[in-house]
Each structure stands twice: as structure tokens, then as C-alpha cells.
Amino acid sequence: MTPGTQSPFFLLLLLTVLTVVTGSGHASSTPGGEKETSATQRSSVPSSTEKNAVSMTSSVLSSHSPGSGSSTTQGQDVTLAPATEPASGSAATWGQDVTSVPVTRPALGSTTPPAHDVTSAPDNKPAPGSTAPPAHGVTSAPDTRPAPGSTAPPAHGVTSAPDTRPAPGSTAPPAHGVTSAPDTRPAPGSTAPPAHGVTSAPDTRPAPGSTAPPAHGVTSAPDTRPAPGSTAPPAHGVTSAPDTRPAPGSTAPPAHGVTSAPDTRPAPGSTAPPAHGVTSAPDTRPAPGSTAPPAHGVTSAPDTRPAPGSTAPPAHGVTSAPDTRPAPGSTAPPAHGVTSAPDTRPAPGSTAPPAHGVTSAPDTRPAPGSTAPPAHGVTSAPDTRPAPGSTAPPAHGVTSAPDTRPAPGSTAPPAHGVTSAPDTRPAPGSTAPPAHGVTSAPDTRPAPGSTAPPAHGVTSAPDTRPAPGSTAPPAHGVTSAPDTRPAPGSTAPPAHGVTSAPDTRPAPGSTAPPAHGVTSAPDTRPAPGSTAPPAHGVTSAPDTRPAPGSTAPPAHGVTSAPDTRPAPGSTAPPAHGVTSAPDTRPAPGSTAPPAHGVTSAPDTRPAPGSTAPPAHGVTSAPDTRPAPGSTAPPAHGVTSAPDTRPAPGSTAPPAHGVTSAPDTRPAPGSTAPPAHGVTSAPDTRPAPGSTAPPAHGVTSAPDTRPAPGSTAPPAHGVTSAPDTRPAPGSTAPPAHGVTSAPDTRPAPGSTAPPAHGVTSAPDTRPAPGSTAPPAHGVTSAPDTRPAPGSTAPPAHGVTSAPDTRPAPGSTAPPAHGVTSAPDTRPAPGSTAPPAHGVTSAPDTRPAPGSTAPPAHGVTSAPDTRPAPGSTAPPAHGVTSAPDTRPAPGSTAPPAHGVTSAPDTRPAPGSTAPPAHGVTSAPDTRPAPGSTAPPAHGVTSAPDNRPALGSTAPPVHNVTSASGSASGSASTLVHNGTSARATTTPASKSTPFSIPSHHSDTPTTLASHSTKTDASSTHHSSVPPLTSSNHSTSPQLSTGVSFFFLSFHISNLQFNSSLEDPSTDYYQELQRDISEMFLQIYKQGGFLGLSNIKFRPGSVVVQLTLAFREGTINVHDVETQFNQYKTEAASRYNLTISDVSVSDVPFPFSAQSGAGVPGWGIALLVLVCVLVALAIVYLIALAVCQCRRKNYGQLDIFPARDTYHPMSEYPTYHTHGRYVPPSSTDRSPYEKVSAGNGGSSLSYTNPAVAATSANL
């Protein structure tokens, strides 16, 4: 190959490489899709396993959109702050950047802004009238309020300080972020605040009378206590100060947030509050006569009792403080949030509250006669009872307090949120509420006659009872406090949030409420005659019943409290949020509400005649029924409480949030609401005639029905409570948030709402005539219907509650958030709303005539319809609830957020809104004539249309629910089983989806989009690809008919809001229109709508409807729409006129799918380039050939030799002659030898040549 032909090959190779690179870029930039135009969305057709099919997908629509009216952008990291609003009258600004701060409101009248940047600080309100701003940037500080009248700002940037309030009247700011300061007490008479953020300073008290501030940010300073009478503030930022007690008579507040402070008691007569947030402070009792509050948030402080006569509150949030009792006569509250404080009782006569949030404090009882509340949030405090006669409340939030009963006659409420408190009953005659959320506090009863509330959220506090006659509340948030019962006659509430408190019953006659949120408290019954509510949120409290005649509410949020019934005649509500409390029934005649949020409390029934509500949020409480005649509400949020029924005649509400409470029914005639949020409470029905609401949030409570005639609401958020119905005639609401409660219906005639958020509660219906709302958030509660005539709302958020219907005539709302509750319908005539957020509740319909709203957020509740005539809204957020329709005539809204609820329609005539947020609920339509809004946010609910004539708005933000959905201008009728349609946001567009063909039950998907394009009035959408549980993706046949429909809404005015999809006006109208069309075109051929546009002229609505080809024509589209105009006017308040329908071509440019794909275009370009290169090469080759002919032949290698070496010539020639170069005629003698060069200039000897030739 010549050099002239090489260069084109190099050029061709270079161009080929560049072409391949360029083609790859094009191919990768167009992955099966095309770019959007400014006004129209085009859809690509991805590869499919089937040919001749159009699969319309959208890569720009999102099924997740901000709620209506929300200006939050998608994907924005928003941190939840449950309650950051300033109190009434406050001029404070709202908390900025607050993270999970349940209560950061400044006190009433305070001008301080709420906590700014606070993290997980449940309560940091400054005291009432305080001008101090709340804690700023505080982390996990449940209560940082300065004392009443104090001007000091709350702890700023404090970490994990449950209560940072300075002592009452103190101007000193609470201890700020102190860690491990064993004793940081200022000297006696000192006005200096305790160690502030001190680190490892064994003794940081300033000298007596010193005005110097303690070491600030000092590390390992053995003694930083200010001297007695010193006004200097304690060391700031000191860690590990063994003794943080202020001296006797000192007004300085104790160390705040100190860790590992064995003794943080202020000296006798000291007014300084005990160490706040101290960790591992064995003894944090203020000295006798001291007014300082006990250590707050101290960890491992064996004894945090203030001295006798001290007014200081007990250690708050102390950890492992065996004894946090204030001294006798002390007014200091018990340790709050203390961990492992065996004894946190204030001294006898002390007014200090018991340890609050103490962990492992065996005894947190305030001393006899003490007014201090029991330990609050104490962990493992075996005895947190306030002393006899103490007014301190029992430990609040104590864990593992076997006995959190206030002493007999105590007014302290039972342990609240105690875990594993076998007995949290307030003493007999006690008015203290049962342990609330206490964990494993064997005995947190306040002493007899004590007014202190039981241990609240205490952990493992064996005995946190205030002394007899004590007014201190029981340990709050204490952990493992075996006995947190207030003493007999105590007014302190039982341990709140205590864990593992076997007995949290207030003493007989106690008015303290039962343990609230106690875990594993076998007995949290308030004593007989006690008015204390049952344990609230207690875990594993076998018996949390208030004593007979007790007015304390049952254990609230108690876990595993076998018996949390208030004593007979008790007015205490049943255990609230108790876990595994076999019996949390208030005693007979008790007014205490049943256990609230109790877990595994087999029996949380208040005693007969008790007014206490059933266990609320109790887990595994087999029987949480308040006693007969009790007014206590059923267990709220109780888990596994087999029977949480208040006793017959009880007014206590059923168990609220109870888990696994087989029977949480309040007794007959009880007014207590059914178990609320109870888990696995088979029977949480209040007794017949009970007014207690059904179990709220109860888990696995087979029967949480309030007794007949009960006014208690059904179980709310109960889990697995087979029957949480309040008794017939009960006014208690059905179980709310109950899990697996087969029957949570309030009894017939009950006014209690159905179970709310109940899980697996087969029957949570309030009894007939009950006004209790249906189970709210109940899980697996087959029947949570309130009884007929009940006014209770249907189960709200119930899970797997087959029947959560309130009884007929019930006004209770349907189960709200119930899971797997087959029937959560309130009874006929019930006004209760349908189950809200119920999961797998087949029937959560309130009874006929019920006004209860349908199940809200129910999961798998086949029927959550309120009964006919019910005003309850349909199930809201129900999951898998086949029928959540409120009964006919019900005003309850349809199920909200229901999952897989085949039928959540409120009954005909119901005013309840359709299921809201329901998942897989085939039918969530409110009944005809219902005013309830359709299901909101329902997923896979084939039919959640409000019935014809219903005034309820369609389903809002429903996913895969064929009925109606709000929050979206586009819906999908999806025929697949458990198929999910995915969408992504596009410019002002709405999703458009294609159904699968694997089921006969249609489902719908509604999603709202807020992303906009350049056009303010143009809407476009791309059909989302739907998927199902089948191996092949669902496909749509190529035959699709599109119709352009426009109409005028004459009663609305067009404004700029309809040009901005983020406005409430725009979203509401768009949602209403979407839902309306879902109701109009219900046949299987309807595929969805898109391109909703609003124009001036009143309001002109233009949109595009899609149907399967051949299923409908223009005339039918217009006819069906005109027939529904009157319904739209009544339901959506839309006066429609000038309807125009026309057949239009496919608006989404689906034909583009038949074109050349991107890779094909890239390949075509590559081929074109290669062809061009070949043409260039051929042209170059032709040019070279032409040039060669024009310029002659260049002989690079000539054939002739021009040089011959002389060696070829002979040296001697005899007959040689000269041969001329041009001579051709040679003689043989003159020829040149071929071997001699062949040159014409050579001489040849003929003889030699001949001889050579012949050789």
C-alpha cells in the first residue's frame, strides 16, 4: 500500500472512535425516555414482556406529596416537635429548629419563646408566670420549667434533663447539663444554684457563705459545693461530683444533669432543689427541712430522699438511686427520672414529689406525710412510695416497680407509664392515679393517706409508694420499682411510666389513678375506694386495679400488668398504656379509668362501679375492665391485657393503647372509655352501663367492649384485643389504636368511641347505645363496633380488628388506625367516627345511626362501616379493612388512612368522611347520605367511595383505592391484587395509572403533585407504571379512549391561588374534583384523569378522562357526569354547569413509543458517519488515481543498472571493440555478456564470452 493510501485509513479510524464515544453518550442520555416539553408530558414505552402493549410511566410524578396546604418541599428534613407552642397568653415566639420536644410550651402567661433548637425535651415549660425562655437547644429534657414565679430561664442546651425546674420561688436557673457529679450540694443556707454542667467534680460546694460561683466547666474537681448561705452558682459543666447536696437551708437548686452523684441531698433545711439530671447518685435526699427538690434526672442514686421536712422535690430523672425519698416532712418532689434508685420516697410529711423518671430506684416513696410527688421517670426503684401522709405524687414513668399502689387513702395517682410493676394499686381510699408508664416497679404505692401520684415512668423501682398520708405523686418514669404504691390514704398518683411493677394498685380508698404506662406490673389496681386512675402505660403489671372504692384511673400505658383494675368503687381510670398487666380493673365502684397503654395486663378492669377509664395503651393485660359501675375509662394503649373491662356500671374508659388484653371491658354501667391503644387485650369492654371509652391503642385485647350502657369510648390504638366493646349503654369510646382485639365494641347503648388504633381486636364495638368512638388505631380487632346506639367513634388506627363497629345508635367514631379489624362498625345509630388508621379490620362500621367517624388509619379491617345513621367518619388510615363503612345515616367520616379495608363506607345517610389514608380497603365508601369525607390516604382500598348522598369528602390521598381519594387530581382504577401504582411529580400534574388485570376488585391510586412547569394553568401527567404481586408487570391494551371534559363551577371564584398548586385552595379543589370523578366513573373501563386546569370564569375546570377503548362513549361520559351534579353540589359544595365533553386523541403522545428508540437513533448516526467516511475515502482514492495519470509514471525502482563495478571488466582484451550504446545490430563477437553487467558501454571478448556461455 502506497503512502498515498495510508492517511485515509488513519482518518477513518479516528472518526470511528469519536463516533462510538459520541453514540454512547447519546444512548446513555436517553434511557428509554424523552425530555419533557414545557407544557406537555410525553411518556416513553419501556421494554415489556408483552408486545403491542402500552405501558405508560411517569418519571416525574410522585405519589408522595406534601399534604394539603403544606408548603414543605418534598424530601425536606423536617424534625418533629410534638408540642412547641407557647402557653396561653404567652408572647413567646415559636420554637425554632426544635427536635422531638413533646412539651416545650412556656407556662401560662409566660412571654418567653419556646425552646429553640431543643431536642427531645418532653416538657421544658417555664413555670406559670415565668418570663424565662424555655430551654434553648436542650436535648431530651422532659421538663425544664423553672419553678412557679421564677424568672430564671430554663436549662439552655441541657442534655437528657427530664425536669430542670428550679425549686418553687427560686430565682436560680436549673442545673445546666451537669454530668456525673455525686454530690454538688451548696452548703446549708446557700442560695447558689447547684453544679451547672459540672464534670467529675466529687464535691464542688463553695465554702459556707461564699458568693463565688462554683467551678464553671471544671473537670474532676473533688468538692465544688458552695458554702452554706453562699449565693454562688454551682460548678458549671463539672462531671462526676460525688456529693452535690446543697448545705442545709441552702436555696440553691441541686446539680442539674449531674452523672454518678451518690448523694445529692441538700442539707437539712436547705431550699435548694436536689440534683437535677444526676447520674449514679446513691443518695440525693435533701436534708431534713430542706425545700430543695430531689435530684432531677440523676442516674444510679441509691437514696435521693430530701431530708425530713424538706420541701425540695425528689430526684428527677435520677438513674440507679436506691433511695430517693425526701426526708420526713419534706416538700421536695421525689426523684424525677432517676435510674436505679431503690428508695426514692420523700421523708414522712415531705411535700416533695417522688422521684420522676428515676431508673432502678428500689424505694422512691416520699416520707410519711410528705407532699412531694413520687419519683417521675425513675428506673429500677424498688420502693418509690411517698411516706405516709405525703402529698408527693408517686414515681412517674418508673420501670420495673412491682408494687406502685399508693398507700390506703392516698390521693396520689398510680404509677404512670410504669413497666413491669406487679402491683401499682394506690392504697385503699387513695386518690392518686395508678402508675403511668412505669417500668418494673414492684411497689410504687404512695403511703397510706398520701396525695402523691404513683410512680410515673419509673424503671425497676421495687417500692416507690409515698408514705401513708403523703400527698406526693408516685414515681414518674421510674424503672424497676417493685413497689410504687402511694401509702394508704395518699393523694399521690400512682407511678407514671413505671416498668415491671407487679402491683401498682393504689391503696384502698385512694384517689390516685392507676399506673399509667407501667410495664410488667402484675397488679396496678388502686386500693378499694381509691380515686386514682389505673396504671397508664405500665408494662407487665399483673394487677393494677385501684383498691375498691378508689377513684384513681387504671394503669395508663402499663406493660404486662396482669391485674390493673382499680379497686371496687374506685374512680381511677384503668391502666393507660400498660404492658402485660393481667388484671388492671379498678376496684368495684372505682372511678379510675382503666389502664392506659398497658402491655400484657390480663385483667385491667376497674372494679365494679369504678369510674376509672380502662387501661390505656396497656400491653397484654388479659382483664382491664373497670369494676361494675366504675366510671374509669378502659385501658388506653394497653398491650396483651386479656380483660380490661371496667366493672359493671363503671364510668372508666376502656383500655387505651393496651396490648394483648383479652378482656378490657369496663364493668356493666361503667362510663370508662374502652381500652385505648391496648395490645392483645381479648376483652377490654367496659362493664354494661359503663361510660368509659373502649380500649385506646390496645394490642391483642380480644374483648375491650365497655359494659352495656357504658359511655366509655372503644379501645383506642389497641393491639390484638379480640373484644374491646364497652358494655351496652356505655359512653366510652371504642378501643383506640388497639392491636389484635377481636371484640372492642362498647356495650349496647354505650357512648364510648370505638377502639382507636387497636391492633387485632376482632370485636371492639361499643355496646348498643354507646357513645364511645370506635377503636382508634386498633390492630387485628375483628369487631370493634360500639354497641347499637353508641355515640363512640369507630376504632381509630386499629389493626386486624375484624369487627370494631360501635353498637347501633352509638355516637362513637369508627376504629381509627385499626389493623386487621374485620368489623369496626359502630353500632347502628352510633355517632362515632369509623375506624381511623385501622389495619386489617374487616368490619369497623359504626352501628346504624352512629355518629362516629369511620375507622381512621385502620389496617386490614374488612368492614369498618359505622352503623346505619352513624355520624362517625369512615375509617381513617385503615389497612386491609374490607368494610369500614359507617352505618347508614352515620355522620362519621370514612376510614382515614385505612390499609386493605375492602369496605369502609359509612352506612347510608352517614355524615362521616370516607376512609382517610386507607390501604387496600376494597370498599371505604361512607353510606349514602353520609357527610363524612372519603377515606384519606387509603392504600389499595377497592371501594372507599362515600355513599350517594353522603356529604363526606372523598378519600384523601388514597393509594390504590378505587373509591375516592383526595389530595390528587388523578386517580387510578387498579384491578390488581395488592398492586401498587407508583408516580412521581410532574409539572402541575397528577398521576395517571393503568390497572392490572389480575383481580376483579378495582382499586384506586390517588396522589397529589405539586411540581410545576412554566405554564401556570397547564396540567399534564404521565401514566404511572403499575405493579402487582404477580411475576409480570400489569399491562394495558393499546385501545385507550380519551375524552376532554370541561365544566363551570359557578359558586367558586377564580383567583391567583388556582394558579399555584401549592396553595390550599388549589389542592382542595383539585382533590375534590379527583374524588368526584372517582365516584362518578366506577366501572372497570375508567383508567383515570389528568391535565386538570383551572381557568377564569367563576372557575372553569378542564381535564382529560381515560377509558378502555370501547367501554364508553361521549354521550355516556356526559350523561353519567350530569347525573352526579346534584350529589357533587351537596357533597363537595360545587355547583356545576356548562358541561362539555368531546372525544380527543391520545394526549400523552403515546405514539412516540412506536418510534425509533434512542439507541436506534445513535446507531443510525453511527452508520451515517461511517457511510460518510467511506464516501470521503473513495473520493480521496479517486483523486489520487487521477493525479497519477496526469503527471506520468514515477519509476521509483528503475529496471536498468547505471553503475557497474570495474571488477566485471577483464583487464586484458585482445580482440575487443567498442560497442556504441545505441547499437542494436551486433555481431556475435560484439555481444555483451549478460553476466558482465549488460551495459552497452562494456567491452566483450567474443572468445571469453563464448567460453563463458558454454561453461
UniProtKB/Swiss-Prot annotation:
Compartment(s) where it occurs, according to its Swiss-Prot or TrEMBL record: Apical cell membrane
Effect in UniProt of substituting Y1191F: No effect on EGFR-mediated phosphorylation
Post-translational modification Phosphoserine, affected residues: S1227
Start and end residues of each stretch annotated as Required for interaction with beta- and gamma-catenins: 1233-1241
Segments of skewed composition (Low complexity): 55-75, 960-970
Cytoplasmic-side positions: 1182-1255
Membrane topology summary: Single-pass type I membrane protein
Domain of life where this protein originates: Eukaryota
Tissue expression as described in the entry: Expressed on the apical surface of epithelial cells, especially of airway passages, breast and uterus. Also expressed in activated and unactivated T-cells. Overexpressed in epithelial tumors, such as breast or ovarian cancer and also in non-epithelial tumor cells. Isoform Y is expressed in tumor cells only.
Effect of C1186A: S-palmitoylation reduced by 50%. Complete loss of palmitoylation, no effect on endocytosis, recycling inhibited, and AP1S1 binding reduced by 30%. Accumulates in intracellular compartments
Resulting phenotype, Y1203N: Reduced endocytosis by 30%. Greatly reduced binding to AP1S2 and GRB2. Binding AP1S1 reduced by 25%. Reduced endocytosis by 77%. Accumulates in intracellular compartments
Start-end of each Sequence repeat: 61-80, 81-100, 101-120, 121-140, 141-160, 161-180, 181-200, 201-220, 221-240, 241-260, 261-280, 281-300, 301-320, 321-340, 341-360, 361-380, 381-400, 401-420, 421-440, 441-460, 461-480, 481-500, 501-520, 521-540, 541-560, 561-580, 581-600, 601-620, 621-640, 641-660, 661-680, 681-700, 701-720, 721-740, 741-760, 761-780, 781-800, 801-820, 821-840, 841-860, 861-880, 881-900, 901-920, 921-940, 941-960, 961-980, 981-1000, 1001-1020
Outcome following mutation: D1116A: Greatly reduced formation of isoform 5/isoform Y complex
Signal peptide: 1-23
Resulting phenotype, T1224A: Loss of PRKCD-mediated phosphorylation. Decreased PRKCD binding. No increased binding to CTNNB1 in the presence of autophosphorylated PRKCD. Increases formation of E-cadherin/beta-catenin complex
Lipid-conjugated positions (S-palmitoyl cysteine): C1184, C1186
Pfam families in alphabetical order: SEA
Record note on what altering S1223A does: No change in PRKCD- nor GSK3B-mediated phosphorylation
Region (Interaction with P53): 1192-1228
Site positions per UniProt: Cleavage: G1097, S1098
PROSITE patterns: SEA
Phosphotyrosine PTM sites in chain numbering: Y1203, Y1212, Y1218, Y1229, Y1243
Domain SEA: 1039-1148
Function (record text): The alpha subunit has cell adhesive properties. Can act both as an adhesion and an anti-adhesion protein. May provide a protective layer on epithelial cells against bacterial and enzyme attack.
Protein name: Mucin-1
